[in-house]
Amino acid sequence: MPNTNKKMRVALSAWEIGRVNSGLGAKIGGLGVVVEELPRELVKAAAKQHIDLEIETLSPCFAYHDKNKLTKLDLLVPVTLAGHTFEFEIYEHVFPDGHKVVYFWDHGQLHWTTPSAIYPTAPQVGLKLYSAVSQAMAGYIKQGDFETIHLHDYHVGLIPFYLGDDYLQKVPVHLTIHNATYQGIVALIGGGYKSLERINLPGEQLFHKYFDFFDNLNLMKACMLKVHETGGKITTVSGDLAGTWGYAAELKQSQQEVLAQATAQKGAPPGEVFLPNRCLDLFEKLPIAGITNGMSDRNRPENLPELKAEVLKTMSIFMNPVTQFEMLARDHNFDVHNLPIKTELKRLLHLEAFGTEPLLDPILITAVGRLVEQKNLGLVADIIERTLVYDAGTKFLILASAPEGDGSGKASEERFARLAATYPQRVYVNNSFNLPLSKLIMAGGDFSLIPSRFEPCGLVDYEASLLGNIVIGRATGGLTKVAHCAYLYEWLDISDRVGEANAFFAQMKTAIDTYRHHPVRHQELMRTAMAIDAGWDASATQYVNMYRYGLLMKQWHAERHELIQKFIKALKEDQQMFAEFFMPARQEYGDYLDWELQKTLQQRNLI
């Protein structure tokens, strides 16, 4: 039978695409994880709706990418910065899973990049780079036959402006915000108009309407406005479509709302609060939808590669000979019906960390991550000693390190090291990256500590929960999706570290008490966590529906335009008189169609 499925082509633009093992990708954080997994999940979800979805992921070509593995296209795209025009080279590669990635390369812009450094630290350098790559991507997109553009974060947020209004009238553009803390805020040089003109945009036309943010450029603000104006959808990575919970709800909170909430928590005015939207009140005014990211089923304990002996044999792994032997001797995958294997993993983890067989029933409390401000893992050091006193069977296993140049993170790293030296049989600290060990810690641990300052998506809570490692953390952003099977504390005053540590420790005590005195309840909680549906099916379906919605919005915009033109034509000789009296109401009393009508009348010089 002939294929009657509808075809749809999507260009998905992002600065990180994952696929680091291929040497042709980039992953600094969760963005790379999501962009790697999302395309194939979208294709599957679209097929269920009888849509043949073709996705091309657009990525910068970083200097460490092996261009010999890429296919160079017979296409050069001109880019202009500060009046100087040069050309980007374009490459493509089809990965074994069938997914196509298009790469954009210019030596002058990208020669400095490394696997751990793909974002410029200087805002002005970043502005030029993001502008250049966005111009190149827009030039490529306009030469294709894409029906939808899906942007990920502000780094590619200039693309709609380089596509131009004529293109945007026909093709919907959507924006997914993975982290609103970083908005592309850049100081002006020579004023707003000149700052935009240097990146090949008409400053007088665009600056005040889209980019102006307290006398800075704000790339995220500009992209949000343009996407909304042209009928696209703005989404973020946790919450529901109505934005009633998760990161979508947090971004809508005003400073006054956050301050009031913080005051209620501590019974006194806070010293300082962290604002998820960074005072960009556009988040409070535009509809922000949440589409909660999923995870590949490979992260479930029954599938996790790092619990398979054959996989571990190819990796640098464990220090303890018993742990090494046992992990290589057989697979240790498990599920909710095979929890004795998790108990064995707990034993092997204890051997690896402390070199001895566990006595009685220790509680293994784990933390895996980066010692950076966002993750707030330094707070764990504040509660270790009081936890050791509270329950003599508690032990901590910390796998975390600070980036070079992060003074606060390095101080936390040193503090953890001192605690490990003071309590060698109760505190284990490792500051080197070890993937198999990180998975063993997750799989063998009882509790996972996640006191994040903010967590837009929160994949780490899924990762821990699926392995029966119950989360103890802060109720923020995407972490709230596991609230039904976790111990979450609420705290917003980031200046009151003692108060936050007390709130954190209160949840720690509750978790320990449940483990010790209510084992049935703990087992129920663990089984609930392991049964979480963390897959991509629901999320991918919502993204596909968003693409369909965008096409329908274009249809509505076209019909609305036709309606206005028809009405103006019907006015005949009364056009001038009507225009003199016509003035749409503002704010909540205004009608969007009225404003569109006024805009058209102005274009005809009737107002």
Task: Locate each region found by the language model.
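Catalytic cores of nucleotide-sugar-dependent glycosyltransferases that transfer UDP/GDP/TDP-activated
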Residues: P2-A579, M583, Q587-W595, N605
